[in-house]
Amino acid sequence: MLTKQAKPQEVQALPITHPENFPVASILCPPHLRPAIAAIYAFARAADDIADEGHLSAEERLKSLTAFRHELLATTESSGAQADIFSPLHQVIEQFTLPVSLLDDLLKAFEQDVKATAQGATYPNLSALLSYCQLSANPVGRLLLHLYGVNDAQALQKSDAICSALQLINFWQDLSEDIPRGRFYLPQDQTQQETPLLIEALCAHAHQLMMQGAPLVHQVPGRAGW
């Protein structure tokens, strides 16, 4: 556990123990950005755990996410139970003028997930899934581009395409886990197809999105690009 005055570099140094973790602050990232990326990831990971882990009711999860949002929107460093997350995050927000609205979009996605799971809701078509990706995935790419100082409209569109593709791929590789938990990430207007053919078609669409975003690597400096 970090102290209440934890610094971004201390978040970066935390051991990775969550089963869905991945090396977010890898050698591909310049050293001066790694603590910021780690702080953003710690925020997203903690919010995801509120929405997805444990045995809380939907009402309890939504209440916890609301409290999490209050911490995010606070103008001073956190001194509450989530100080290990928000103290370094607030420093990063100030240092890089990070758009808080993008972080809030992630919370909106988690709230949408909680409500959809509780209601057994489905997504009527691929457009609805892509709208969800605008909240759940695309903000992450835009936050990273902001750290790199890449803000032009074309770069943001390419980033959105890549992030949406990655989110869709994640949905479809986890169907066997999500469906028993009441989460349905298949477009309902296409489910009349046999499942293997449906997944093949959906993955082809995700590949198309990924290729639309691929030229972004030429706009990102350093090892993260080409």
Regions found by a protein language model. Give the residues of each.
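Acidic catalytic motifs of isoprenoid enzymes
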Residues: 1-221
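Amphipathic alpha-helical protein-interaction segments enriched in hydrophobic
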Residues: 223-226
